[in-house]
Amino acid sequence: LGQNTHELVTRLLSALPLSVRPRLVTSDGEFHTIRRQLDRLQEEGLDVVTVAARPAETLADRLTRLVDDKTACVLVSSVLYETAEIVPGLDIIARACSRHGATLLVDAYHHLNVVPFDVHACGLEQAFITGGGYKYCQLGEGNCFLRVPPGCRLRPVLTGWFSEFSALPREGRFRGVEYGAGATRFAGATYDPTSHYRAAAVFSFHIDQGLTPERLRRISRHQVGLLKDAFEALDIDAAVARVEPMSDDRRAGFLAIRTDRANEYFHGLRTRGVLTDFRGSLVRLGPAPYLSDDQLLESIRLLRDVHDSLRTQARLA
């Protein structure tokens, strides 16, 4: 467990044999945690190879073709954070990494608790998986994890004293740097774990309410579908704003609307009491399971109001 995915990802990167395997393969659809860190490592001379995230249908195949014996790690999301598109075929990447002795890191942040995620069904038994509870798990800040595959013997350079906790009571001087068993080899040092107790309480609430990943997926698909249908019924010119195209079963936990005026849509909705966010030219509408259909439809009505207001301003300019 960790406070954020960055501290966990960097510990993993520090364990890789980058001096003899300097290649890192990734996509341009990764969240800034990975994107920024890899950009900086590239400045230091590592061979960071980046491919287009879309079309997502072919992303796994395109990443796989780039894996070779110089590849230390492939870093890819299971759901694209900008568009909510589910990336298929991660097992193909996993097999390629296994053949070449490379590591696979899957960012599942936008997958968890909104789309069922089965490590074994996805063929990711030997993959590292990172994610957190800030979004769909609704755990608040400070709840992230790194799933470590069984039998891992990596020795991270960035390592804290929690990783040798079991060795501390022994007498005498330490002989070299020892690591704990299993995932503890990636442990850090002292931090405030209060957030984990909050997370445990939230998960207990989910269990009490019967909010399983499968049920949450059904709720999410209904809500996102409702938003999509309501937006498309507005009949806004697609050159101005349109739903990011993908099949409904490939869309995860939010509706992405592409518009050159994403910033203005965001602020216009916010002044009307609708909280969204935007990434570049994409407005993201992410419904929580406790919102009613009427509230969601009202948000689209207010989006229409924002659109009409912007159009009026443009005519008067």
Language model feature labels by segment:
Residues 218-228, 232-272:
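Conserved PLP-binding catalytic core of the aspartate aminotransferase-like
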Residues 1-20, 32:
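Conserved beta-loop-alpha segment that forms the PLP phosphate-binding cup at the N-terminus of a helix
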Residues 123-175:
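Active-site PLP attachment segment
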Residues 56-113, 128, 136:
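Active-site phosphate-binding strand-loop segment of PLP-dependent enzymes
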Residues 65, 263, 267-317:
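PLP-dependent enzyme catalytic core of the Aspartate aminotransferase-like
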Residues 26-76:
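PLP-dependent aminotransferase-class I/II
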